[in-house]
From Swiss-Prot:
Pathway: Cell wall biogenesis; peptidoglycan biosynthesis. It holds the Pfam family Glycos_transf_4. This is Phospho-N-acetylmuramoyl-pentapeptide-transferase. It is an enzyme of class 2 (transferase). It is a multi-pass membrane protein. GO terms for biological process: cell division; cell wall organization; peptidoglycan biosynthetic process; regulation of cell shape. Belongs to the glycosyltransferase 4 family. MraY subfamily. It is found in: Cell inner membrane. It catalyses: UDP-N-acetyl-alpha-D-muramoyl-L-alanyl-gamma-D-glutamyl-meso-2,6-diaminopimeloyl-D-alanyl-D-alanine + di-trans,octa-cis-undecaprenyl phosphate = di-trans,octa-cis-undecaprenyl diphospho-N-acetyl-alpha-D-muramoyl-L-alanyl-D-glutamyl-meso-2,6-diaminopimeloyl-D-alanyl-D-alanine + UMP. GO terms for molecular function: metal ion binding; phospho-N-acetylmuramoyl-pentapeptide-transferase activity; UDP-N-acetylmuramoyl-L-alanyl-D-glutamyl-meso-2,6-diaminopimelyl-D-alanyl-D-alanine:undecaprenyl-phosphate transferase activity.
């Protein structure tokens, strides 16, 4: 919004032209989201407490977590509000990628809100039935995936509907341009063409998978939000690179017209995340809830797809990946051994992985900070792919 005002006033106020620079607006978006979060945070926490929107702790979780019962939850709404206001203030409203990321973010946020509502109102720690939750995640992810298959492939300011009709007319066999290929990091010219159906399938898996992965990681005070901030910031750098003709050509990345504007949104996520961490650090005054975790995961996955860094997201979000794999391995092994031996056996003391270390004697703060350190190292490895090719 402010960019449009700046363009309108640019002839009279020359200095305001600085807002044409994406990097400047990214800094301002981060600062705005941070300020909104810090100012509104105490009021939101107080309101959640008055409304008795408290966390319902699972009975089979670590015993040390029982003291968290009643801590205000659904604080992820604060993050979403800060991100939305900051992005709408500083981003270019004509950019299609900004809107699709915002819509996916709030779509998954709505799913999380409904899930948290069931937990709070009905005092059901399990929340929304798994099948119902997955249905809505799959639906939103599929719609976004189909849209992005053509949005990423299209030249700047091109209508997408004619491209979709051309794909249907081709018998669903129309190839996508090379910039929509799956990029393999650390190699200069290695990429794999996906086609529309392959692109949609991969995009769907990345968006839905990342959303659930962040949600599974959000089990300790501050554990999920800091890796989200780091990964989101790194994706903002990738967005800036692939969204510029000069940088993308020099660093051998595909040029994605309009992607650079996502740096503003990524900066807003980082600022809002840091503000939330102020209140979510141990001992947490508020929890993110599914409304925040599902939304942020969906945002990261969508941005990674747009900037064509799905594999790099897998690297940088390694903490999210390992947490998810630990749950999958635990459940699969337990069911298999129960069928074979009549009694389920476990690989980990408890899943997700952060509980395994908690039960093993690590303090909650030790688990969190060590996972942060690992996440930082993985993000640096991901950023190194900008040059190590």
């Amino acid at each position: 919004m402010l960019l449009e005002i700046a363009r309108w006033l640019s002839d009279d106020v020359r200095a305001i032209g600085v807002l044409e620079y994406i990097t400047m607006r990214a800094v301002l978006a981060c600062a705005t989201a941070l300020l909104i979060g810090l100012v509104a945070g105490p009021r939101v926490i107080r309101k959640l407490t008055e409304m008795k929107i408290g966390q319902a702790v699972r009975a089979y979780g670590p015993e040390s977590h029982l003291v968290k019962t009643g801590t205000p939850t659904m604080g992820g709404a604060l993050i979403l509000i800060a991100v939305a206001i900051s992005t709408l203030l500083w981003a270019d409203w004509t950019n299609r990628f900004v809107w699709v990321v915002l819509l996916v973010t709030f779509g998954f946020g709505w799913i999380g809100w409904m899930d948290d509502y069931r937990k709070v109102v009905y005092r059901d720690p399990e929340g929304m039935p798994a099948r119902q939750k997955f249905f809505w995640q799959a639906t939103i992810g599929l719609v976004a995936a189909v849209y992005l298959a053509f949005a990423v492939s299209a030249p700047a300011n091109t209508e997408l509907w004619p491209l979709f009709k051309a794909w249907v007319s081709s018998g669903f066999a129309m190839p996508l341009p090379t910039r929509a290929d799956l990029i393999v990091p650390f190699f200069k010219s290695v990429s794999y063409p996906l086609g529309v159906l392959g692109f949609v399938a991969l995009t769907w898996a990345v968006i839905v998978g990342t959303s659930n992965a962040v949600n599974l990681t959000d089990g300790l005070d501050g554990l999920a939000i800091m890796p989200t901030v780091m990964v989101g910031s790194a994706l903002g750098i990738f967005a800036y690179v692939v969204g510029r003709v000069d940088y993308s050509k020099y660093l051998l990345f595909p040029y994605i017209p309009g992607a650079a504007e996502l740096m503003v949104l990524c900066a807003a996520i980082a600022g809002a995340g840091l503000a939330f961490l102020w209140f979510n650090a141990y001992p947490a005054q508020v929890f993110m809830g599914d409304v925040g975790a599902l939304a942020l995961g969906g945002a990261l996955g969508t941005i990674a797809v747009i900037v064509r860094q799905e594999i790099v997201l897998f690297i940088m979000g390694g903490v999210f990946v390992v947490e998810t794999l630990s749950v999958m391995m635990q459940v699969t092994w337990f069911k298999y051994t129960k069928r074979k031996y009549g009694q389920g056996r476990r690989i980990f003391r408890m899943a997700p992985l952060h509980h395994h270390f908690e039960v093993g004697g690590w303090k909650e703060t030790q688990v969190v900070v060590r996972f942060w350190i690992i996440s930082m190292m993985l993000v640096l490895i991901g950023l190194s792919t900008l040059k190590l090719r």
